[in-house]
Amino acid sequence: MDRIAGKAHTKHYQKGEFLFRSQEKDDALYIVNRGKVRIYRLSDSGKEQLVRILNPGDFTGEWTLFNPDAVHEEYAEATRDTSVCMIQQHDVQEFLKEYHAISLKLLGEMSQRLESSGRQTAQVAVESVITRLVLFLAENVEPEMGNSPTITLPMAKKDIASYLGTTPETISRKFGELEDEGLIQQLSGKRIKIQDLDDLLLYSE
């Protein structure tokens, strides 16, 4: 691990600065050390859709590591003062050859992100907002939580709106609708109490 740290260099970004923009060519892996980064894409009409939020320990840039001609398809913007560790393509590839555990972790994360991206695209295209929200809440329930879990939202509601392809006003109304129906309870600190997960999922059908 000391060898990996020796190849990385730290870069600091102020709130609102971009790590990279769509269509920029790059060959680095970015690992968030401090702060927060939002990854988003723009539609042809200029509408922004959130892809994911990166917290300390999360990474991005993995898709450009294996293709020398690849360009970024998304934007990466620091949402607060942020520091990231950057490792160049050649060094990452050497580490992956030597450390199989890192290779498996990277491939696993890439697979999950690809699946999530495909699911997100399909849901925005064909599902209602309430169904998208219900499925989003359900995806944040861990198996060991049972059928009446309390979850912590992984992002602010305005970011959930962007992620689900709708507006903050609409997402607030839908949260209110679910609460009025007795399906959830909105608690403090981004916590949501799901009264009955089965009933919640049935409501979206």
Indicate where each model-derived feature is located.
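Cyclic-nucleotide recognition modules
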Residues: M1, R52-S111, E115
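Short proline/glycine- and basic residue-enriched helix-capping loop/turn segments at helix->loop/beta transitions
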Residues: M1-K15, V71
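Cyclic nucleotide-binding regulatory domains
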Residues: E17-R80
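Short, locally clustered residues in the helix-turn-helix/winged-helix DNA-binding domain
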Residues: F20, N33, S111, A138-E142, ...
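ATP/adenylate-binding site constellation spanning eukaryotic-like Ser/Thr protein kinases
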Residues: R34, P56, D81, Q89, ...
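Polybasic "coupling" helices that flank or enter modular domains
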Residues: T79-R80, K97-P168
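Phosphate-/nucleic-acid-contacting segments
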Residues: N140-E205
